[in-house]
Amino acid sequence: MKKKYILAIDQGTTSSRAILFDHKGRITGMAQREFTQIFPQPGWVEHNPRDIMTSVYTTITELLNNTQIDVRAIAGIGITNQRETTVIWNRQTGQPIYNAIVWQSRQTKNICDQLTTAGYQDLVHAKTGLLMDAYFSGTKVKWILDHAENAHTQAARGELAFGTIDTWIIWNLTGGQVHVTDYSNASRTLMYDIHALRWDPDLLTMLDIPAAILPDVRSSSEIYGLTQTPYFHGEQIPIAGIAGDQQAALFGQACFEPGMAKNTYGTGCFMLMHTGKKAVESKNGLLTTIAWGLNGEIEYALEGSIFIAGSVVQWLRDGLRMFGKASDSQAYADRVSDNGGVYVVPAFVGLGAPYWRSDVRGAVFGLTRSTTKEHFVRAALESMAYQTRDVLSAMQADADIELKELRTDGAAITNDFMAQFQSDILAVPVLRSQIAETTALGAAYLAGLATGFWSSREEMTQHWAINRCFKPQMDKEQREHLYAGWKQAVAATLGFRVA
């Protein structure tokens, strides 16, 4: 039968999606299912790994039922996932020994503090390109092994398996036959040497984690195994692509050359710049990460993570009740010609790149009696653009590459005011992608390359299309004046201590 589709499984922090793409990279069907978030203590975030798989299976079933396609027309499956989230399970039974600890969770902060005090930060940064932070998988693995009954003994005997969510999904889809991850996900674990391309024995010793629990690390585009579940009507479909969500979005945006960058405007912002086959060490508060591994070669990226972006709009809507729908924010911002001197620094959970200060909290500056709701909303939207410039400035300094354009996706950038202001503050064109689901598209592309569904990256570049291009309209003097005000507001925020 002719292969007409690639299936992408996009497993995110709050929901799972199954999306079908055709040969032109167009969406032909989609299903989505949310699952329960677990908050055992303040700052802790967990998922039931079984709930994740149930949501994956449900979306596959709904998609196939809704589209009525012949399963045999699916050439392959690509998987993209919330990164860093950690699962450990029993190899024999397939049962998790504890909940999945989510990337957002801060429950391993004490472990990070102890390792930093012990002097391990430089070792971690040199080998992994990351920081000693609870964000990454390594300390989550240690926490589970330390707290689950008899876990260290079982792990040492090789009875347990660790995986990020991609690994957990593939294990289940293949009936427990395949225990793998890809370079992009391995590079986010705090245990993988991104230069030597191996699980690092020094880092494993530091964390007291036995190598026996680790998955094989493979390229981001190859056939890892075949499905062995009833959800595909008994058909064995190749699982052929893996990438962490932000790297998948970089691939889906066709950022294939050094200096090309994308920014995803979701709850937070994740900006990645392709740096080619060279791992660029950041001296400006960014992360060095593996973008993907293809055709025997590794390509790298610089990443800046902004903790609060689109969620500032949710705060205005739900917390302050300034408007009824998130989309109303654009109309409020457009009613005033400027921010009225108001700056919102949305450090609700601290500041991410390039500051990395988890101890600071949000602040608002410049309020007067003439400040209106419209000024406040505009200032909150502007904060996303300022934070993106903070990250871009660090990227350009680290990579010594001048950005020519910024490719964007995510819900917040559908706001035309936000997109135009972003272009003005960066002084570069902002290109909004025609397809919003660039993360899933990236996973589909990787699977399509491995199965021959697509022939080359050049073919994918031809498929990439712009919804709209926003070009800078602000003069340099005004741009720098506004950004100077932001830097002053951030400096004041960093200096404030909560009693």
Curated annotation (Swiss-Prot):
Catalytic activity: glycerol + ATP = sn-glycerol 3-phosphate + ADP + H(+)
Keyword set includes Heme: no
Metabolic or biological pathway, per its Swiss-Prot or TrEMBL entry: Polyol metabolism; glycerol degradation via glycerol kinase pathway; sn-glycerol 3-phosphate from glycerol: step 1/1
EC number of this enzyme: 2.7.1.30
Domain of life: Bacteria
Chain sites annotated for binding ADP: T13, R17, T267, G310, A411, N415
Function of the molecule: Key enzyme in the regulation of glycerol uptake and metabolism. Catalyzes the phosphorylation of glycerol to yield sn-glycerol 3-phosphate.
HAMAP family membership: Glycerol_kin
Protein name, per record: Glycerol kinase
The species this protein was found in: Xylella fastidiosa (strain M12)
Organismal lineage: Bacteria, Pseudomonadati, Pseudomonadota, Gammaproteobacteria, Lysobacterales
